[in-house]
């Protein structure tokens, strides 16, 4: 259960709460010269970057969603998994414009073992929501927000909303009340407001600032202890 947003003001600010069950997934924060990401251990033994930030401003995140049969995994050259698409974007192997061409020309499907939707954004704040089996939407408004339910076809996941899960509504209210001066501090206030506890607790929260070329993050809801990671200039 995760929360992701992009705010397009005088600075492009993105925020993400990574909420997982530690009995299901193994993760660790990875900091490299060109990437900051939450590494997810996969069966191939590698920590994959399905949630992260590239120094070029690309930010990609996957969020769990109740799956639909139209998005079920398929092989073949005309299909691409949402996991591969997101990781390639975070690695800057493909650009935002190339992602747009891919979602227009290929069928985007779930990975074989997980049903996820994605939000991808670039250094200019251009934002794309991708929902396998449903479609995609490029967003132009002041902000974008997604949790674990469909934005493009809300009725498809309405029956699967967890009772009491109002993260989207609470985050939406905070974003609605903000102006152009939306800051890193404001972003962490939002993430703190919608943090999760229990088995699916928030394990990592990060905020990226385009103007600063910096990612700020904290682990395990320790919002009093924010760590700063700045990408080096080439």
Question: Predicted regions: what is each one?
Answer:
Residues 101-113:
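Phosphate-interacting basic helix/loop segments used at nucleotide- and nucleic-acid interfaces
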Residues 1-91, 116, 121-234:
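C-terminal, well-structured catalytic/ligand-binding subdomain of enzymes
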Residues 88-92, 98-101:
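Short N-terminal edge-element motif at the start of the domain
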């Amino acid at each position: 259960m995760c929360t992701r947003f992009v705010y397009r003001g005088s600075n492009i600010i993105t925020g993400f709460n990574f909420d997982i069950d530690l009995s299901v997934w193994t993760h660790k924060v990875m900091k490299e010269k060109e990437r900051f990401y939450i590494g997810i251990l996969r069966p191939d033994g590698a920590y994959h970057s399905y949630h992260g930030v590239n120094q070029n401003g690309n930010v990609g995140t996957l969020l769990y969603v109740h799956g639909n049969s139209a998005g079920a995994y398929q092989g073949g050259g005309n299909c691409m998994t949402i996991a591969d698409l997101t990781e390639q974007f975070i690695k800057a192997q493909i650009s935002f414009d190339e992602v747009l061409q891919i979602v227009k020309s290929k069928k985007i499907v779930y990975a074989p073992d997980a049903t996820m939707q994605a939000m991808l954004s670039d250094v200019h704040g251009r934002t794309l929501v991708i929902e396998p089996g449903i479609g995609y939407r490029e967003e132009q408004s002041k902000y974008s927000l997604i949790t674990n339910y469909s934005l493009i076809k809300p009725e498809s996941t309405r029956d699967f909303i967890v009772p009491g899960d109002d993260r989207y509504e609470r985050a939406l209210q905070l974003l609605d009340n903000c102006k152009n001066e939306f800051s890193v501090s404001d972003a962490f206030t939002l993430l703190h407001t919608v943090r999760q506890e229990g088995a699916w607790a928030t394990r990592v929260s990060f905020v990226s600032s385009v103007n600063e070329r910096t990612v700020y993050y904290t682990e395990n809801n320790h919002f009093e202890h924010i760590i700063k990671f700045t990408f080096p200039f080439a």
